[in-house]
């Protein structure tokens, strides 16, 4: 049985299309009609000269959204993270972060290769650091060991299943880092999902962090871009590092235009994606051989494990789901990730769960 769906809807009214149910990531989103129109009509200039009016508007809105002085558009979240590390770290010193964070695991060792910084990973049960763990990990300058230079936080935490670091814990971590004399960078690729989940502003969650970045091309649905945000002096330095890394773009207003539409059309409805994810999680949890507590699904990411009775690896499960028109990501031997976004409807969630149930049942009957 195929679970491919024909849908029409989403912000800006996506054109109807026959498609698979793509739950691999929220990066698979297609630009809305409104985004495409805004991109085609965008006023542009040379952004390396600071002359692209649409980029300037996007950066001003992003800075205001985060209640900061300045923002910088860069091609990707990885580049934004690496610019921040370059500005806040020192060669041969350690960046303290949760062991599964994106900066440590999905950026190909860039902080070591580019900035000479070393990871100091801290393991947690749920992706959320405790201030005492920062104190224990901290290494002062001097002596015979590496020393700590900064703290990297992630909110929401991708590999922890989209868990939200709540405002009070963010305050504690930022405060502890300050006591230790360490600057803080927040990888807020999905910070707007975190904000929607706990009912506060993204600026509130990032309060006190020296730099914060968020992505336009995940749940917000724009095709390209992330923003690095901080004080005016730091972002002026970031502009130089962006150029060094090859991230200076010319008529980038065609990309920035989609981001402006995302702020208006997509950001206000992120909670809908969370509701879809919760429903999908509830249905997945009913499938034999699946280990998942739906209460842990706080945003748009679902991570579930396979127990021994499932009789297959995560990769095998993902392959069989793909044959039924449902795409998911295998993370290691027994962990599967699904991510909802504005293309995924409640009927899609139900169809995806039905496909999963069918795959597991087929395996059980041999």
Language-model features and meaning:
Residues 9-14:
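Short, positively charged and aromatic/hydrophobic N-terminal segments
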